[in-house]
A protein has these predicted regions:
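A short, conserved beta-strand element in the Rossmann-like catalytic core
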Residues: 18, 129-131
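Short glycine-enriched, charge-decorated loop/helix-capping segments at active-site entrances
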Residues: 25-31, 96-100, 170-171
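Conserved core of the sugar-phosphate nucleotidyltransferase
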Residues: 132-173
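Short phosphate-binding loop-to-helix
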Residues: 74-120
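Short beta-strand segments
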Residues: 13-14, 81-83, 123-125, 152-159
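N-terminal glycine-rich phosphate-binding loop and ensuing alpha1 helix
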Residues: 2-71, 80, 85, 119
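Residue-level signal for inorganic ion chemistry
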Residues: 38, 113, 127
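Short beta-strand-to-loop acidic/aromatic patch adjacent to the donor-nucleotide binding site
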Residues: 119-129
Length: 173
């Protein structure tokens, strides 16, 4: 295995249960050979230079995820790590409120992966398409060492008008 300890890592939030969608959208086949949207992101990220990927998933979807997207990533030569987003992974002194069943969101997902992230990293959603340019921009930025107190965070942004579909709106529930 290559030494990838200091090369940028791609962290992918893929723990969603797809309740509105009706299934696991992060592994749903959309491409002509059964590719998921995430497979396209992994391809583009790998071409941009990312060698290590951390999938943040739930134990409930582990088998389905590992046998599809996880297997594709490993076959493509990516170093794959897993982190598990569970409700009880919280900072010291915090507890899960009685009756809480939904995950805490983005920050909690990243916290869940803290033990397997050991280098500068980029975060994406498993069910969004970003395109190769996005991965090239973020990989090159992180590789250039733009981290530390002066540059603690970075994001790739897009003009809203360039991202809205002409085919209609998206309902968030």
């Amino acid at each position: 295995m290559k030494d990838t300890a200091k090369k940028p890592i791609l962290v992918i939030m893929a723990a969603g249960m797809g309740s509105r969608f009706g299934g696991l959208k992060q592994i749903e086949a959309v491409g002509p050979a059964g590719e998921a949207i995430l497979d396209y992101s992994l391809f583009d990220a790998h071409r941009a230079g990312f060698e290590t990927v951390v999938f943040i998933i739930k134990h409930a979807i582990e088998d389905a995820f590992k046998s599809t997207v996880g297997a594709h990533a490993e076959k493509a030569g990516l170093n794959v790590r897993y982190a598990y987003q569970e409700l009880d992974i919280l900072p010291e002194g915090f507890t899960v409120p009685e009756g809480r069943i939904k995950p805490w969101g983005t920050a909690h997902a990243i916290l869940s992966a803290a033990d397997v992230i050991d280098a500068p990293f980029a975060v994406i959603n498993a069910d969004d398409y970003y395109g190769r340019t996005c991965f090239e921009l973020i990989y090159n930025y992180l590789s250039a060492g733009h981290t530390g107190p002066k540059y603690p965070w970075v994001m790739v942004g897009y003009l809203l008008g360039n991202t809205v579909s002409t085919n209609g709106s998206v309902s968030r529930g």
